[in-house]
Amino acid sequence: MPKLNCHHFEQNRCNSCQWLHKSYTEQLAEKTSDLKRLVSPYLLQSTEFLPAVTSPLAHFRNKAKMVVTGSVERPILGILNDDGTGTDLTDCPLYPQAFTPLFPILKTFIGRAGLVPYNVAKKRGELKYILITQSQHNQSLMIRFVLRSELKRPLVERELPMLLAQLPEKSVVSLNIQPQHSAILEGEQEIFLTEQQVLEERFNQIPLFIRPQGFFQTNPTVASQLYHTAQEWIKERPITQLWDLFCGVGGFGLHCANTLQTNNPNVALTGIEISASAIASATKSAQQLGLQNVKFASLDSAQFALNEQGTTPDLVIVNPPRRGIGKPLAEFINQLGSPYLIYSSCNAETMAKDFASLSHYELKKVQLFDMFPHTAHYEVLTFLVNKII
């Protein structure tokens, strides 16, 4: 398979994609070998190690995080160099092609609204970042201007109609206030400038809602296959109750419950996530799908599991952050005794450590999903079955 050509990488201006010097075939081979090495202690003769799910080489990202440098008349959108200057990355080949005409529109808007780029060395200026996300479902955009203060809000609101006239319908525009002089991407305060406050995405006919500051997969092509695969793995299993821990906006749980409820309307889903805004998104999705017996709650996943002693779901889904689920939750899952476990991970190293603690389970399926081409990172989906079944 070919390599992706990027002049920023070739000229050493941007090294975010550390593996651009490798062909895509090499990248996949290295990732597959890394995953095999990590899970090898848990591979049985009956374990299916499935072929990797590949990504498009370019235009696969649904979001851009642009540091704003330069001047208000000539803003630079891209990354910040060590010397404080900026590199323009508006032609980055990872972004959707719809972003190409958007960047000049945003540069004009910056000038008209007087959003002086923040100068780190001088601690002056207002505009720190522009964060952009696109919905593949309806091409609507979420554009977030990260500002030092609300000083320029009146000017932004004055120029907003001209910006909105050039954006797709159902787009979201907001100001995020980040007053600290530090490399923090966003602050806690979000000011919506549009009535629309969420982007609707759809994977496999399942509506999912993206909110500012919420986590959402950055590679929609691969993410939709990830959720669909989980759905396929469990659809014929005798499952009437499932828990989706670390559920985020509900991607895994909603896909699984939706397919299971077509055969059995009594299937019940409980989704747990510490982020209240993600839970609001998941609840909205369940309502739109018309799913019954679905409950999402904003709690710490480990704490929820420990509180629910005495209840045993047929399926537990875990999709933890990079640190993994940890020993206490793994031991609780052992004691819980659910027949089936789906573990999705963005860090196979911590997942493998968790497998050592999940001693009541054996590994039935493993599949690599190349969510992050041109880097060493990947997503992995696994299916485990209780040994007593």
Curated annotation (Swiss-Prot):
Which UniProt keywords are present, listed alphabetically?
4Fe-4S, Iron, Iron-sulfur, Metal-binding, Methyltransferase, rRNA processing, S-adenosyl-L-methionine, Transferase
Residues forming the catalytic site: 346 (nucleophile)
Return one GO MF term: iron ion binding
Q: What are the annotated disulfide bridges?
A: none
Q: Give the residues the record marks as binding S-adenosyl-L-methionine.
A: 217, 246, 273, 319
Spell out the InterPro entries in the cross-references: 23SrRNA_MeTrfase_RlmC, MeTrfase_TrmA_AS, MeTrfase_TrmA_CS, SAM-dependent_MTases_sf, U5_MeTrfase_fam
Q: Which residues bind [4Fe-4S] cluster?
A: 6, 14, 17, 92
What biological-process terms (Gene Ontology) are attached?
rRNA base methylation
Q: Which residues cross the membrane?
A: none
Reaction it catalyzes: uridine(747) in 23S rRNA + S-adenosyl-L-methionine = 5-methyluridine(747) in 23S rRNA + S-adenosyl-L-homocysteine + H(+)
Q: What EC numbers are recorded for this enzyme?
A: 2.1.1.189
Matches recorded under Pfam families: tRNA_U5-meth_tr
UniProt keyword GTP-binding, yes or no: no
PANTHER family per UniProt: RNA M5U METHYLTRANSFERASE, TRNA (URACIL(54)-C(5))-METHYLTRANSFERASE
Q: What does this protein do?
A: Catalyzes the formation of 5-methyl-uridine at position 747 (m5U747) in 23S rRNA.
This one is known as 23S rRNA (uracil(747)-C(5))-methyltransferase RlmC
Species the sequence originates in: Glaesserella parasuis serovar 5 (strain SH0165) (Haemophilus parasuis)
